[in-house]
Amino acid sequence: MSSSPSFRPFAMPLLLALGCAGLAAPSWADDGTRRSYEIPAGSLGAALTRFAGEAGVSLSVDPALVSGRSSAGLNGDFGVEEGFARLLQGSGLMLQPAGEGSYTLLPMPEEGSRVQQLQPIAITGQGSGAAADHYAGGQVSRRGGLGMLGERDFMETPFNLTSYTSEAVKNQQARTLADVVASDPSVRTTNPSAGRFEQFSIRGYSLYNSDVAYGGLYGVLPTYSIDMEMAERVDILKGPGALLGGLAPNGSVGGSVNIEPKRAGDEPTTEFTAMHASSGQLGGHVDIGRRFGDDQRFGLRFNGVKQSGDTEWDHQSLERDSAVLGLDLRAERVRLSLDLGRQERDVDGPMERVGLNAGVKVPDAEDIHHNFAQPWTYSRAKDTFGALRGEYDLSESLMVYAAAGARRGDYDFLRHAVQLTNDAGRFVVSPRAFQREEEVRTATVGLRNWFSTGSVGHTLNLSLNRFDMTFDNSGARYANGVSNLFDPATLPEPVTPTAADNPTHTRSVLSSLALADTLSFAGDSVLLTLGARLQRVEVDSSEPGEPDQRYDERATSPALGVVWRTTEALSLYANYMEGLTQGQTAPETASNAGQVFAPYRSKQVEAGIKYDMGNLTSTLSVFRIEKPAYYTENGYLRPDGEQRNQGLELNLFGEPLGGVRILGGAMLLDAELTRTANGSNDGNRAIGAPILNANLGVEWDLPQVQGLTLTARAIHTGAQYLDPANTQKAAAWQRYDLGARYAFSVGETDVTLRASVENVMDKAYWASANVPDGTATGLTLSTPRTWLVSATLGF
């Protein structure tokens, strides 16, 4: 077994970041004007605390007064006292001024009674101004989506949740989801950039694009790559989330990602961004947002993107086009939204993973200087999608909601695998045409009720989900050729198929019913979530000449989460989650291609600490996740034992010093195979699971030049095994990025210029050996040095 990779290059920056004392964000005092607020429904104490903080006023109250009480939240423009009155409706409490900028709460007097003065204590601090949802530094949002539990502040969440803002996405010049997750130490991209598709790993387990939710709905977003210009927020939840969002279509258990769609803000948005990437990628992005009608209740947000040109690799080009329209209505009791989108992505010469036959040594990535995919290979993906959502407040304590989404995807590939047969880099080119059509229909309905029993507050959630997906695969095979990884040969484009693949038709229906109750104790300082989801997995797969395969499995998955806010700055949390996952399907490269395996259970136990110092937050968590493992033997995919990943995570984000922002962390991972066939691989490390991942990104606003920001990022990924026998190993790697941006105004136009260089040292390395269960093993090659330049004009 190998020794642990060195952590030395990252130790000092991380220790310095941990040692930085938070500097409180400045508040602004109430000036008597109405301001815009968006306070989520939940416990009354939390709602009042947040509102007072955003309004920049002081509120003092006896904790016993608000314990166990709930609030329907607040959304719109309000004055300070008007906002307090709305939050307090039905609570039996009243607001009383206590001096300039200060207030207290008293019980509503009964008729003929005298009010008793209580001894108050302060429960609120500084306000955060207009960007209330953004944590200090603006890169991470305080609130994130938790599916049926709604949106919550990260300090009140019994999970490891990080939500990246659209501001962070823009400043990273992120084009797809792979660019955003590069900032997270627990997440890695596991397929080549500008390949046929994007895939990821979270906590050492694979995450498919099809398991990325869109406003809480699975299966709506494009299957193979997701453009980021549509995203208002990117929520990354570590660990299984079956209770929260239902069954993930492809069974990702290491974590989940939710893309929150953009909405029109109170201020008009009109932005155009011109983009350029090295080797000729040119493009533009338009972002327009407006609100209309009485109280600006109607909103429209449009994002359109077009980018095309050559990439960093020879004979490779990429074109992406997307258009997403978001409409919304916000009234006193009703909130509606509709999102419609179209995305197209064409790649010529897409890179492939590099597989190795048994006994072949891992090649040196530095010796690869050319694109080893044939120039006639291509990937064509077209997705049309939409989602409709609605919420209605039946009363101040009861809300019902519903959402429905749909997508149609059409995909066409001409590709070949890259499987090395010797140490000299020889591989057989086996061209294959592959067509796939997907249709998804998904829906959820639910209700949320706030009430109290004695001194205990309750937030009760009931949710019913259904996901229905059909897909049809077809294809053809062509005559083989021979090429070399280090000296690729250009072969003739295939014309006449030598064999046709049997068409397959598969339908998956995932349905579930979930009930959860979040109980609040001790003045909302302790939040206990108890829940369970009754799940059903139905799979029906057919292929001409083969017997139909059908599965209909049911299971109940319990969940528990607890948060103890020992102080406003410190939260302790723990959770236990289970999930039922649709079984793996043998890939087209397997001898038993198309075979569908039975659904399986996964389990997670996690505990952690969250420390919010005002302008810097650090989280530390330990976790253990167990799930069945699969392996390929003599060309056949088979289930084999269990994979157990346990680890330690550190996350850091914020602005510890004025004008200095950090974003990063580390993950130590012990990924072990157990109960394998005949015990042959027991105790070995799982495929593609590095011992150590570490990230550190820093931004510095130069005080000498107003508007100028310098950026830097370092990424470390430990060594990884390519095979379960642990005989083939890819070395650890580091990547360094540098950048700058300059914001200024020209008349009435706001201008932001951005420039960055990814992989400054232009190092070649094997970025990942992680592959999903049921997929042929392979290595992902790094992307060469990449220049990104953009100019954003705000009118």
PLM feature segments, named:
Residues 346-360, 468-477, 559, 563-606, ...:
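Surface-exposed extracellular loop regions of Gram-negative outer-membrane beta-barrel proteins
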Residues 522, 622-626, 639-724, 792-794:
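Gram-negative outer-membrane beta-barrel transporters
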Residues 460, 574, 605, 687-795:
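Conserved C-terminal beta-signal and adjacent last beta-strands/turns
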Residues 53, 58, 73, 119-267, ...:
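Acidic, small-polar-rich N-terminal luminal/periplasmic segments of exported/outer-membrane proteins
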